[in-house]
A protein has these predicted regions:
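Rossmann-like S-adenosyl-L-methionine
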Residues: 4, 10, 211-438
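Residue-level signal for inorganic ion chemistry
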Residues: 16, 32, 75, 189, ...
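Short beta-strand micro-motifs enriched in acidic
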Residues: 38-42, 131-135, 192-196, 437
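Extended interfacial segments that mediate partner engagement and assembly in macromolecular machines
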Residues: 52-64, 70-184, 196
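Short, solvent-exposed loop/turn elements at beta->coil junctions and helix N-caps
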Residues: 113-120, 187-192, 417-422
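Carbohydrate-binding surface patches
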Residues: 190-194, 198-210
């Protein structure tokens, strides 16, 4: 069937409509394309289709510098001009606020601010992950394809920090060589690199048990210039693997990055935004929204290793920082020591169970993709805080949660600023400023 792509979804697909008006999610097309597509599923309210050929290409199309972008799943929007990507991300936020958050067009027009971005649309990632596969009887490392069941062998990735582009090929080659003579049981391999500090860490994710530590360390050190090589040991069922421990095979045993005025050290399992320059925009927006005073008490929920905790502690009298992930809590404590900050209480545990008893003047929440639990919203709404900064990585759960805040009647969103941390993909962060209803 011939279809014209109307807009991009919050996902890799474009959205088109049949002559009868049925929505069709089309893989392989971008806004403005006219395509010949074949249906792969057809439900009562929407269908899915795959582009067979582009009949008339969109003026928004762009040439990708990546030779793998047509088959690799890492940059699904690489074929679209960057300005069009930014416009689509803004529109996805507006759409979610209207459809899910039930905000009016006038409210959205006032609330949503122009999207912010860092300088680089390529070469921005400080982290990349490689997955193992068996090809022609040999172990190969590569990236997940658009078909998630396939691993694409790559020699480089234009999304990764340019200075360290050759590291991918070196690591993949060294481990591929080793894995074909020793059973490394690799689950995945993470590479973190910082242009600012020069730190490069290779993290090997494997099950617990025997492991040729010395041999692996020597081969990787010979093949790459790294500051740290670690093994992250995991256990549990395949779909619910958890970290059992981390051991340093060579070097520092952690990765160091400079963000804003802070220096942070992170263990391999800990989360850190993959786009450091754009993460600094998040920090600026959070601090602008909260505008903390020296005598005030702040609360940082889902604080991770301290991305927002550290700048808050510089400006507030005291900060309670709550994080459920053990490795991140340990990293937070270490980062507080590095920063010589003693006005922060790191609290390990669930954000709801460990919600501080003392009311904070300002709060920042940076929950996972699932958003805030209803109980968390109720607790925040029950405080006497004057302002809340909500950092979200999913517009759908953000819109749902903002509606819940409005329904609670204590806080109302005054601004929502999208920030493009992930160029060439559909993902987008948003910082929302909520203030107490007068």
């Amino acid at each position: 069937m011939q279809l014209t792509i109307d807009t991009m979804t919050y996902g890799p697909d474009g959205l088109a409509h049949t002559p009868e008006g049925k929505a069709v999610f089309v893989a392989g097309g971008i806004t403005g394309d006219t395509v010949e597509a074949s249906f792969v599923s057809d439900g009562p309210s929407f269908a899915r289709a795959v582009t067979e050929r582009v009949i008339e290409p969109s003026p928004l199309r762009a040439d990708s510098p990546c030779p793998y972008s047509s088959i690799c799943g890492g940059c699904p929007w690489a074929g679209m001009a960057y300005g069009a990507q930014l416009a689509a991300k803004e529109e996805n936020l507006r759409s979610a606020l209207q459809r899910i958050g039930k905000f009016s067009g006038e409210q959205i027009e006032i609330m949503v601010k122009p999207i912010r971005r860092a300088k680089n649309e390529w070469g921005y990632r400080n982290k990349i992950e490689l997955a193992p596969s068996v090809q022609n009887g040999k172990i190969r490392l590569g990236m997940h394809g658009k078909d998630p069941s396939k691993i694409i062998k790559v020699d480089s990735c234009p999304l990764f920090e340019k200075k360290y582009g050759k590291t991918i090929k070196s690591v993949a080659g060294a481990l591929g060589f080793l894995a074909n003579s020793r059973d490394l049981e690799l689950e995945r391999v993470g590479i973190r690199a910082s242009r600012r500090t020069g730190a490069v860490e290779i993290a090997l994710w494997t099950p617990t048990g025997a492991f040729p530590r010395g041999q692996v360390a020597r081969v990787l050190q010979d093949a790459t210039k790294t500051s740290s090589i670690v093994r992250v040991m995991t256990k549990g069922e395949k779909k619910a693997r958890r970290v059992a421990g981390v051991e340093a095979l060579a070097g520092e045993g952690s990765w160091t990055e400079k963000i804003g005025t802070e220096t942070m050290r992170l263990s391999a399992p800990s989360f850190f935004q993959v786009n450091t320059a754009a993460a600094e925009i998040l920090i600026d927006l959070v601090m602008e929204a909260l505008d903390p005073e020296p005598e005030e008490f702040a609360c940082d929920l889902y604080c991770g290793a301290g991305t927002f905790t550290l700048p808050l502690a510089r400006r507030c009298d005291y900060v309670s920082a709550v994080e459920s992930y053990g490795p991140a809590v340990r990293d937070l404590r270490r980062n507080l020591d590095i920063a010589h900050l003693d006005n922060v209480e790191p609290i390990g545990g669930d954000a709801v169970r460990e919600f501080p008893e003392e009311d904070a003047d300002v709060l920042v929440v940076d929950p996972p993709r699932a958003g805030l639990a209803p109980e968390a919203i109720e607790l925040i709404a029950s405080t006497s805080a004057r302002d809340v900064a909500y950092v979200s990585c999913d517009p759908a759960t953000l819109a749902r949660d903002l509606r819940r805040f409005v329904d609670e009647g204590t806080f109302a969103p005054v601004s929502a600023t999208p920030v493009d941390l992930f160029p060439q993909t559909f993902h987008c962060e948003t910082v929302v400023h909520l203030t107490r209803v007068k």
